[in-house]
C-alpha cells in the first residue's frame, strides 16, 4: 500500500519536472531551436493547426531556422503567423523555404527571460510539493484507519520527503542549465 503511494508520487513528481522542462525549452535563447515555434498555429482550411504539422522545421545553423512548408500556398500564412507571434522574429521567404533569423538577445531581454524561467521553476517546485502533500495525506489516512503504525507512517513520510528533495534538485539543475544557456553570448 505504501509502496503504491510512493510510486504514484514519484510518477507524478517526474511529470511535474518534465512539464517544467517542456515549458522552459520553449523560452528563446540565443540558439535556434525548432521547439521555439511549437506554439505557432496556422489557419488551415478554417482550423487552427500547429505549424509543426504543416511544415518541416530545422535549425539551419545556431542563429537560423529553416521552415519547409508542405503546401506552398501556406507560406504567406506561415510568415504572417510568425510575425504576429510575440517572439519578435522576422521571417523571410526564399522560394519554398522560409528562413527565420534569430536576432541576438539584449542583456535586458536575457534578464527578463531568466525571471520568466525562475517563475516557471517556482511553479514546478510548488507542483512537486503538492504531490508530496497528497502522498502524505494518503499515508496519514492509512494511519488514521490503523492500517499502518506510527513508525511506518514516519518512515514513509521521510521517504516521500527524500523523493521530493531529489525531484526538486533535478528541477533546480534544469533551471541552472537554462539560466547558463540564456546568459551565454
UniProtKB/Swiss-Prot annotation:
Keywords: Cytoplasm, Protein biosynthesis. GO terms for cellular component: cytosol. It holds the Pfam family RRF. It is found in: Cytoplasm. Its main location: cytoplasm. It comes from the Bacteria. GO terms for biological process: cytoplasmic translational termination. GO terms for molecular function: ribosomal large subunit binding. PANTHER family: MITOCHONDRIAL RIBOSOME RECYCLING FACTOR PSEUDO 1 (PTHR20982:SF3), RIBOSOME RECYCLING FACTOR (PTHR20982). Responsible for the release of ribosomes from messenger RNA at the termination of protein biosynthesis. May increase the efficiency of translation by recycling ribosomes from one round of translation to another. Belongs to the RRF family. This is Ribosome-recycling factor. It comes from Sodalis glossinidius (strain morsitans).
